[in-house]
Amino acid sequence: MNPDAPTPKNKSSRSRPSDRPQARKKAKIKTKGIYLRAIGDAFVKLNPKSAIRNPVMFLVWVGTIITLSVTIEPNLFGTTQQKNPQLFNGILTGILFFTVWFANFAEAVAEGRGKAQADTLRSTKSETLAKLLSPDGKITDVPSTSLKQGDTVYVVAGDVIPADGEVIMGVASVDESAITGESAPVLKESGSDIASSVTGGTRIISDELIVRVTADPGKGFIDRMIALVEGAERTKTPNEVALTVLLAVLSLVFLFVVATLPVFAYYADTPINVPILVALLVALIPTTIGGLLSAIGIAGMDRVAQFNVIATSGRAVEACGDVNTLVLDKTGTITLGNRLAEEFIPINGHSIEQVASVAWVASVFDDTPEGKSIVRLAEKLGIRYDLDPNQAQGVEFSAKTRMSGTNLPGGREARKGAVGAIKGFVRSRNGRITPELDVAYEQVSQQGGTPLAVCLDNEIYGVIYLKDIVKSGIRERFDQLRRMGVRTIMLTGDNRITASVIAQEAGVDDFIAEATPEDKISVIQREQAQGKLVAMTGDGTNDAPALAQANVGVAMNTGTQAAKEAANMVDLDSDPTKLIDIVSIGKQLLITRGALTTFSLANDIAKYFAIIPVIFASANLQSLNVMNLTSTNSAVLSALIYNALIIPALIPLALKGVQFRPLTANQLLQRNILIYGLGGVIAPFIAIKLIDVLITLVGLA
């Protein structure tokens, strides 16, 4: 029961305990399918057109072709003095092949998750018959695919909404579980800025609507989401492009170094075969991060999708990691939104107990959190009646009446609702409105609460004070953001005194009271003028300019079409609080990329000490063979086997992301160097030595 908004959805219906084993089973089957599809896709990505998009792995791909050639013809580049060169070159070719394949597999697994989500979205699309409404009121059944922007359709209970649109007449409950996963229906009505947008593929479960189509065939919300999560040509983010260029430059430097080695080797009387040169190049270039870079970026979008948020691009997710300022609405983001009964205020000479009694009767059939809180507050005062459900009848809240209540035996009527609605109800029954009601109304409003008037028949007994509760743990989350250098600004329509109290309780850095939609744009522009990146949420048409202005704009799925088109992310659950989680995911993406880059470059140090000393053994460089590797063949194979296996070993970390901690930039740098820098040096030393021992045991040294 909320006279100012649709009935809240029941979040508890989302996952019952009995559903969880089946859900886990489905998840396991889905994951298995992703990996099976990725195996095939990894082979498809071996074609040159795909391989050349990754400069680092393309060098490995070319090296594989070269070693395959010398496996077939060992003397292709001159006479070799190796023992059994075809066996060594064949093993080397196999290792290089799997190095490329593992990198492709990592990218294919990350892409597979997006394809699985696209399949889920595609399953909601079905061609149905739509009731096309002509200007003269005639209804014609037409295929939904023939609808175009501007058409008007009529939908009734049980119908699937044929296309995206705006409600222009009617009020109805809509099941959006096919898109959001939320089983509770959502109220849609005309004339509401945030509840008038409907999505094709959802189903009406009660009443009827007249909808104006806002999207041509193939350009609806679901179509756009499928294209986004399944797009074959993923646009790299600016940071990803910069890192790719850096890795390519490093690879070219190492290529130049390796290309000049034969000259030095000739004067050192230590000739180097072409397969060894290829192996040395592959060992030195940053193949680990080169093989996982695409997977990290794709997985970032996937982690956002797991929160039921669709990002228009990886650029949007990455921008979240650089956000400096969050602009947040108070209601639903900082406060619960489901206001709870705080106090009964009597008027017209009535007592608190009398107000509580009428409020209890008017709310006893109300199953919303607000209605239940009114009953609880009344029962704390000792109020309770034994109502016969067969004789009393509950009256549900509706957007038209803006009130709810109970019809009692004998024709008596108890109602609660918006003050204006109750005034109209009482006047229609020849009741009297006193100035005390307006005084109580202002008293509650000045405290930032919502006033509900309570009446029995044509007599108003008093006002219920509904208080908006600050969300539990929100202060700690803002503290975490503050430690990361993210500033929070609360926008609210409340007066300055109320806004100040809530801001202090929630722990935001700044607030703007009595805010208008224009204030949102002003705040965003002010912060951006200071060189900051800004994120915000919105759902109404009046939020669209601010969503477009923000670096990260998250639109609610229940919002208007204009808001969703202006934003670069859409939250299918319509939960504004998710903005905080999205920012954390963006920062986790950047941290993961930085950590694995550090680890990959540190790996090269160990591989350098593994191969160089044994290649130039006759040049008195054995003192650098700190791992005491058996032979040149053993050192090369050990380093490259490690080089290949570390890629699949790090796939789970690349997909899941490095554990995120709210630390400062200096603390993050120190942590990365200690764990992934030092660890990246030590781990390959140990692994390469163990592999060398195994190779020696099987006689390949």
Curated annotation (Swiss-Prot):
It is found in: Cell membrane. One of its GO terms (cellular component) is plasma membrane. PROSITE patterns: ATPASE_E1_E2. Mg(2+) binds at residues 539, 543. Keywords: ATP-binding, Cell membrane, Ion transport, Magnesium, Membrane, Metal-binding, Nucleotide-binding, Phosphoprotein, Potassium, Potassium transport, Translocase, Transmembrane, Transmembrane helix, Transport. GO terms for molecular function: ATP binding; ATP hydrolysis activity; magnesium ion binding; P-type potassium transmembrane transporter activity. It is an enzyme of class 7 (translocase). Belongs to the cation transport ATPase (P-type) (TC 3.A.3) family. Type IA subfamily. The system is composed of three essential subunits: KdpA, KdpB and KdpC. This is Potassium-transporting ATPase ATP-binding subunit. It comes from Anabaena sp. (strain L31). The gene is kdpB.
